[in-house]
Amino acid sequence: MCPAKLKDEDVYYTKENVSLTEYKIHKYVYNLHIVNIPKIKSYNKETKQLKMVRVGTMSISDYYGESAENIDDELFTKIRNMIQTLYDHDILYVDITGYNFIENDKKLWIIDFEHAIYNHPRKTDEFVEKFLEGHNGWNPEFL
């Protein structure tokens, strides 16, 4: 008996309308190996499609619901550590919502660098500062 052949969409996820900047930041962060981020398979500048390895099918918000109150402190600590690590490597990640994090195989993954910026010189964001200081909640600008 032959094993079932996986479909392309089972292995890869294609994100539409990805700017060159988002692609470059995603690639930069992946190459740093500092946080779990999907591996890029390809990027098409003309169609603005980013094809990456699928790391799961449900975001934290899909799994726990949209309300930050449904998320336990331990998971928020993991997210906070991830955001701090990015910040320490000059990436300001402001789109802190449950839709941009995936738990799979006991790993936490971060996705969607559309609103992330290279942080030179160091810029600040009021919500990110509050979050890094211990606030457990999602950025209301992205809800």
State the predicted function of each range.
Residues 74-75, 88-92, 104-143:
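C-lobe/activation-segment region of protein kinase-like
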Residues 36-76:
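Conserved structural core of kinase catalytic domains
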Residues 56, 98, 115-117:
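Short, glycine/acidic-enriched loop or turn micro-motifs at the edges of active sites
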Residues 1-28:
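ATP-binding glycine-rich loop module of kinase domains
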Residues 96-103:
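Hydrophobic residue at the +6 position relative to the catalytic HRD Asp in the kinase catalytic loop
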